[in-house]
Amino acid sequence: MTSLRPTRDVCMIKIDGLTKIFGEGAEAFTALDDVSLTIQSNEFFTLLGPSGCGKTTLLRMIAGFLDPTRGQLMLDGKDLLRHPPHQRPVNTVFQSYALFPHMTVSENIAFGLQMLKRPKAEIAATVSEMLELVQMTAMADRKTAQISGGQQQRVALARALAPRPKVLLLDEPLSALDFKLRKEMQLELKRLQHETGITFVFVTHDQEEALTMSDRIAVMNAGTIRQIGGPRDIYDHPAERFVADFIGDTNFLKAQMVSSTESGALVRLASGEEILAKAPEGGAHSAGQAVTLAVRPEHARLCERTDALLIGTLDNVVYFGTDTHYHVTMEGGGTFILRRQNQPGQTQTLAINDTVGVCFAPDTAQILKD
């Protein structure tokens, strides 16, 4: 497939105040609450959030399977709400691939093109191109029941890409795959998006999928968007406690504001230690105010008690192969988790119930909005 490679500063999807309310009166439920965002051309954009957050509802409205209660939805400068699903330049790949078992791989890929009444020569050329794109040429004449789950996923993608939609919608398409195959398909999806230049809108509750594949992520909760940003920005600079808690592992520490500076905020930990932490943009805190600090497990280390910011008791040590997690019960309550990457020849010298110190660079601690 020839990629047009549109620049990312061109808006493909513009959503303004989109709301979806199911039911009426006392039984009314707001699944999507005044959502606004833009998705650029040639972007891999992910809607990430827990079950029931509204991400699939939003995807279904883009596809045309649901009508919004109110709001505006534009695609490539045109009002999408005026068009039924079959007239929208989008295709959808679902969790269940919905392949036709009585058809071959090639026939499945050709089906949508046949429904669009494309010329036979064009269909044959496009099917061949799609088979090569998803690396399934050798399986062209097999029935879909004779191929693996990962191969079925590739066929579903090829069928959706064949009509050359402007936008491809993907509704948790990897959730049925095993762990190893899911990781392989993450790389495959990103490759396909890059090679085709088509805008991908991907829905998932899996943070690893979102961080691995996305150009940008919209983190959703309770029908609203809590933060939009690149994977590194979302992970390193969560806008609020929900985002910090949902994306990766995070330790939350109670602290008290001492003063604000140009480079951050001086806070006092429960241990009495004062550190200069990162403050959220636009956040205003007064001296004496209680605040919450977020510290990622990989940013902390065990250290001598004399150098420690926090003191606690080693409660558990969990080996994960590539790294080891240390669970420390802090003086005053609460658990702090540290992550250390394992190295060849590394030995474990600590024992459960040992008193340990916890250190972290102050600039890795971030004050969160509640």
UniProtKB/Swiss-Prot annotation:
<dbReference type="InterPro" id="IPR008995">
    <property type="entry name" value="Mo/tungstate-bd_C_term_dom"/>
</dbReference>
<keyword id="KW-0547">Nucleotide-binding</keyword>
<keyword id="KW-0813">Transport</keyword>
<comment type="similarity">
    <text>Belongs to the ABC transporter superfamily. Spermidine/putrescine importer (TC 3.A.1.11.1) family.</text>
</comment>
<dbReference type="InterPro" id="IPR012340">
    <property type="entry name" value="NA-bd_OB-fold"/>
</dbReference>
<dbReference type="GO" id="GO:0016887">
    <property type="term" value="F:ATP hydrolysis activity"/>
</dbReference>
<dbReference type="InterPro" id="IPR003593">
    <property type="entry name" value="AAA+_ATPase"/>
</dbReference>
<dbReference type="InterPro" id="IPR005893">
    <property type="entry name" value="PotA-like"/>
</dbReference>
<comment type="subunit">
    <text>The complex is composed of two ATP-binding proteins (PotA), two transmembrane proteins (PotB and PotC) and a solute-binding protein (PotD).</text>
</comment>
<protein>
    <recommendedName>
        <fullName>Spermidine/putrescine import ATP-binding protein PotA</fullName>
        <ecNumber>7.6.2.11</ecNumber>
    </recommendedName>
</protein>
<keyword id="KW-0067">ATP-binding</keyword>
<keyword id="KW-0997">Cell inner membrane</keyword>
<feature type="binding site">
    <location>
        <begin position="49"/>
        <end position="56"/>
    </location>
    <ligand>
        <name>ATP</name>
    </ligand>
</feature>
<keyword id="KW-1003">Cell membrane</keyword>
<dbReference type="InterPro" id="IPR027417">
    <property type="entry name" value="P-loop_NTPase"/>
</dbReference>
<dbReference type="GO" id="GO:0005524">
    <property type="term" value="F:ATP binding"/>
</dbReference>
<keyword id="KW-0472">Membrane</keyword>
<dbReference type="InterPro" id="IPR013611">
    <property type="entry name" value="Transp-assoc_OB_typ2"/>
</dbReference>
<dbReference type="InterPro" id="IPR003439">
    <property type="entry name" value="ABC_transporter-like_ATP-bd"/>
</dbReference>
<dbReference type="InterPro" id="IPR050093">
    <property type="entry name" value="ABC_SmlMolc_Importer"/>
</dbReference>
<dbReference type="InterPro" id="IPR017879">
    <property type="entry name" value="PotA_ATP-bd"/>
</dbReference>
<dbReference type="Pfam" id="PF00005">
    <property type="entry name" value="ABC_tran"/>
</dbReference>
<dbReference type="GO" id="GO:0015594">
    <property type="term" value="F:ABC-type putrescine transporter activity"/>
</dbReference>
<feature type="domain" description="ABC transporter">
    <location>
        <begin position="13"/>
        <end position="247"/>
    </location>
</feature>
<keyword id="KW-1278">Translocase</keyword>
<dbReference type="GO" id="GO:0043190">
    <property type="term" value="C:ATP-binding cassette (ABC) transporter complex"/>
</dbReference>
<comment type="function">
    <text>Part of the ABC transporter complex PotABCD involved in spermidine/putrescine import. Responsible for energy coupling to the transport system.</text>
</comment>
<dbReference type="Pfam" id="PF08402">
    <property type="entry name" value="TOBE_2"/>
</dbReference>
<dbReference type="InterPro" id="IPR017871">
    <property type="entry name" value="ABC_transporter-like_CS"/>
</dbReference>
